[in-house]
């Protein structure tokens, strides 16, 4: 099974369980491989959603390993501060605060005002999606105040 077929199977499992597939990531940390499946849904993802989808994907991976060697499967929400790696991530993040690094090293930070024809408008700047090296949403934690 190739990566595209595997992604389609995972996407179908996620969508059949009322969630959307946000991203799939293979990483190595501390000498361990991780196959991460990030899911979203309106109102937020619950621990039960993650466990259910993990339990449906796991038997498939027992038959068809997604990577060579030992790995850990994780299913989770992408979180409040999440990577933006696809055009649809930008489209769904309009109105949120983002940090972007372009291919030439320029750093932009501000509200994602629009994403039209693969061009992100961040504050007063515009940047083409193909010129983005990395991007993520962020939260300004000091703007939240606890009131008794």
UniProtKB/Swiss-Prot annotation:
The keyword Cytoplasm applies. Keywords: Cytoplasm, Ribosome biogenesis. Signal peptide: none annotated. The lineage of its organism: Bacteria, Pseudomonadati, Campylobacterota, Epsilonproteobacteria, Nautiliales. Belongs to the RimP family. It is found in: Cytoplasm. GO terms for biological process: ribosomal small subunit assembly; translation. The gene is rimP. Required for maturation of 30S ribosomal subunits. InterPro entries: Ribosome_maturation_RimP, RimP_C, RimP_C_sf, RimP_N, RimP_N_sf. Gene3D superfamilies: RimP-like superfamily, N-terminal. This is Ribosome maturation factor RimP. GO terms for cellular component: cytosol.
